[in-house]
From Swiss-Prot:
The gene is Cdsn. It comes from Mus musculus. The keyword Secreted applies. This is Corneodesmosin. Residues 41-275, 415-466, 536-561 are annotated as: Disordered. It is found in: Secreted.
Length: 561
């Protein structure tokens, strides 16, 4: 009996031991898997992403990300970890066509907008998201209203990462591209990646040619009013025309007619560094300054009388003027000259709260009130790229963001209100291969605002075609006497991007002319005040209360000292 029970007990004990061993082997795997799922950094919405992030490339070697840009964007894998995005087939036409941008956790979302009446290509075929592949041949012409892309768009198989040939000439008005042609077999490499084709045609026909340079990460090409963009690192410009943030109640001040322009462009200079990865950021900057001795509270200048151009951001350490970050979004692009770390943005050589910029001797401090947090002020110029292009067909566009307040982008036009558009607050390098009326000569009067002197290049005819392919817009003053010079027209009025990439309406608070002598004596309002109410750029980079002067409730007009 005993001998007959022993094997049975042993057998039972053996089974129990085996069960324990199996549980010991299986449970840790299950727990590890569940813990790994819970703590998967790829699912962290606050994760800082980069183009070569394994979360984007994929861990299994199959299709890693499916580009869902709005309509018929898709992912076509020709090999392991092939990120095939015929990016931004969400290029529906009109005033809110979206182009793809990075969005933490999901790879990208829509945030840029194309303006004008059709024919915009913020994505589509020729969106080359691998370092391999020169796209040659005709990539399918678009005509008619449907704008479906057909034909052979050329297989991408080289290593140059350039696009040659006519990259999708558009002659229709709808121009949505399904991006269904063309095979991609390259790996995602950030050094020569092209997410969204930097050609944008809004209005007139004409082919656009894209020649991205090496290192031009995430190019987009939303431009305005029938302008064909040619340049691998072109920017997208969203504006609120007629929004009027002012630094003081001075009629016809440099800020009395300027729009708010934010930057969602891709250009990252060769000297640009990012802490923790390339997490894109859009920033709204407000300028503060005294205008020089005896002009406190007036529009700032370069140390002379009021009404002159304010200093660029490069001169923030000089006696007059300074810039402050007043809003922004972590759902859009990082601009040149900036770094991102710990949820904050920093300029190259940023200030800390131990050494902040506090205005200048004899000039008022910044209007933000108490001591600032790190990353709130800029010491270098995040607007003008530090690297240019020697190619005659591709110049980087250097608009990073609009220094609002006194100075910056100003209204200009041909004399009619409808044709007014902003001049540039800093130098802009723009290439146009075929455009309609993207540039307008300025009349130069105080009612029209200032205009810009041309740099290299010229404007010919009514089509505003650029003979040399390059125009550099200089800083605008408050009352320019030089007429006939180009200004960039921005006819649309949505602000750039909400959390879901949808355009935000312009708040009615800023649409009227402001100043003590304006009709109805409408007070000028600070963009900081508008941002705290409307939040047009998504999540703010800092507490809105910090950006308001002490003791002043939200919603009240701001007077800047």
């Amino acid at each position: 009996m005993g001998s007959s029970r022993a094997p049975r007990m042993g057998s039972v004990g053996g089974h129990g031991l085996m069960a324990l061993l199996m549980a010991g082997l299986i449970l840790p795997g299950i727990l590890a898997k569940s813990i790994g799922t819970l703590s998967d950094p790829c699912k962290d919405p606050t994760r800082i992403t980069s183009p070569n992030d394994p979360c984007l490339i994929g861990k299994t070697g199959s299709n890693s990300i499916s580009s869902q840009g709005g309509s018929s964007s898709f992912s076509s894998q020709g090999g392991s970890s092939s990120f095939s995005s015929h990016g931004g087939s969400s290029s529906s036409q009109g005033s809110s066509s979206g182009s793809l941008i990075y969005k933490p956790g999901t790879g990208y979302s829509q945030s840029s907008y194309s303006y004008g009446s059709g024919g915009s290509r913020p994505g589509g075929s020729g969106s080359q998201s691998g370092s391999s592949g020169s796209q040659s041949g005709s990539s399918g012409s678009q005509s008619g209203s449907s704008g479906s892309q057909s034909g052979s768009s050329g297989s991408q198989s080289g290593s140059s990462g350039s696009q040659s040939g006519s990259s999708g000439s558009q002659s229709g008005s709808s121009g949505s591209q399904s991006g269904s042609s063309g095979s991609q077999s390259g790996r995602w490499v950030s050094s020569s990646s092209q997410w969204v084709s930097s050609s944008s045609q809004s209005g007139s026909s004409g082919s656009s040619r894209d020649r991205p340079g090496s290192g031009s990460a995430l190019p987009t090409g939303d431009k305005t009013s029938g302008m064909s963009q040619s340049g691998g690192s072109s920017t997208s410009q969203s504006s609120s025309s007629n929004l009027r943030p002012c630094s003081s109640n001075v009629p016809d001040s440099p800020c009395s007619g300027g729009p708010v322009i934010t930057h969602s462009g891709p250009y990252i200079s060769g000297t640009h560094t990012v802490s923790g990865g390339q997490r894109p950021v859009v920033v709204v900057v407000e300028q503060h300054g005294s205008g020089g001795p005896g002009f406190q509270g007036m529009p700032c200048s370069n140390g002379g009388p009021a009404g002159k151009p304010c200093p660029p951001i490069t001169s923030v350490q000089k006696p007059y003027g300074g810039y402050e970050v007043v809003g922004g979004s972590a759902n859009s692009y990082l601009v040149p000259g900036m770094t991102y770390s710990g949820g904050k943005i920093y300029p190259v050589g940023y200030f800390t709260k131990d050494n902040p910029i506090r205005g200048s001797p004899g000039a008022p401090s910044f209007a933000a009130g108490p001591p600032v947090s790190e990353g709130k002020y800029f010491s270098s110029n995040p607007i003008i790229p530090s690297r240019g292009s020697s190619s005659s067909s591709g110049y980087p566009v250097g608009v990073a963001f609009q220094p609002v307040g006194s100075g910056g982008v100003q209204p200009c036009g041909t004399g009619s209100v409808s044709s007014k558009g902003p001049c540039s607050g800093t130098r802009i390098q723009i290439t146009s291969s075929s455009s309609s009326t993207s540039y307008h000569p300025c009349s130069g009067g105080p009612s029209q605002g200032p205009c810009s002197s041309p740099g290299t290049g010229s404007i010919s005819g009514g089509s505003s075609s650029l003979s040399s392919g390059k125009i550099v817009l200089q800083p605008c003053g408050s009352k320019s006497t030089s007429s006939g010079y180009p200004c960039l027209s921005v006819p649309s009025s949505p602000l750039n991007g909400g959390l879901n990439g949808s355009p935000q309406p312009v708040p009615s608070v800023g649409v009227k002319l402001c100043g003590l002598n304006s009709p109805g004596r409408v007070p000028c309002r600070s963009i900081r005040n508008i941002l705290t109410q409307v939040k047009p750029l998504g999540p703010q980079l800092m507490d809105p209360k910090v950006s308001l002067p002490q003791g002043e409730p939200q919603g009240e007009p701001l007077e800047k000292s």
